[in-house]
């Protein structure tokens, strides 16, 4: 069987590379209201650095709104772009706020907890008929994440997480991400295609449904600047 660090390394490696993704973001309130955004996502991940650019394609009243996120060794940084308004930097204290006011935070989108050095296997559990290994990841320093630990339920056959739970320093469960659909990418590797996110807001739930992924793309640093999204 794989050790915790081997499992984390394998998941870290499988997330590396560049991709252009089309995704539907749906935020549902418990009262029944629903908000839907069609997104284009540019993603570039290396062993040490993550760059993301989320851009709203639809509906028209939000078209062109974008969020750019970057994380290297230290804390994550980001920019919020709204047409006809000045570009706004995301403060460190705002990294736990919702991406496009969803239940997924900026930090969740950009951080790669499989690359953290502290990894431990703490048990196993079956999720939706899949026998999973539970991996517990802790950040290298408190500045690297808004979370104190992350638990992920890994399918050891396909090397995809089926569930992710993120905890605060007081041990409170802050966010839970369930993978509801696993698809195959262009290289026939399994990837999480649809996610359901429960966050600190108790009155809403967010779903991401990936529609398309193109991995035959190469981005430059300029692709992750406001000029490229406006």
What role is predicted for each listed range?
Residues 16-20, 36, 49-51, 75, ...:
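Extracytoplasmic
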Residues 44-104:
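An acidic-aromatic
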């Amino acid at each position: 069987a794989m050790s915790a660090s081997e499992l984390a390394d394998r998941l870290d490696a499988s997330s590396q590379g560049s991709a252009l993704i089309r995704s539907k973001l749906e935020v549902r309130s418990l009262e029944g209201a629903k908000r839907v955004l069609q997104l284009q996502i540019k993603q570039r991940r290396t062993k040490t650095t993550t760059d993301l650019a989320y851009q709203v394609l639809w509906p028209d009243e939000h078209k062109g709104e974008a969020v750019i996120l970057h994380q290297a060794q230290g804390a994550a940084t980001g920019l919020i772009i709204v047409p006809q308004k000045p570009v706004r930097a995301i403060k460190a204290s705002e990294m736990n706020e919702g991406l496009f006011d969803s239940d997924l935070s900026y930090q969740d989108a950009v951080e790669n907890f499989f690359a953290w050095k502290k990894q431990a296997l703490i048990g196993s559990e079956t999720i939706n008929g899949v026998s999973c290994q539970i991996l517990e990841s802790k950040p290298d320093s408190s500045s690297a994440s808004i979370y104190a630990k992350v638990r992920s339920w890994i399918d050891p056959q396909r090397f995809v997480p089926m569930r992710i739970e993120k905890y605060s320093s007081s041990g409170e469960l802050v966010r839970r991400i369930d993978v509801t659909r696993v698809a195959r990418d262009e290289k026939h590797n399994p990837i999480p295609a649809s996610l359901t996110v429960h966050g600190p807001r108790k009155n809403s739930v967010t779903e991401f449904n990936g529609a398309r992924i193109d991995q035959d793309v190469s981005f430059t640093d300029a692709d992750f600047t406001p000029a490229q999204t406006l």
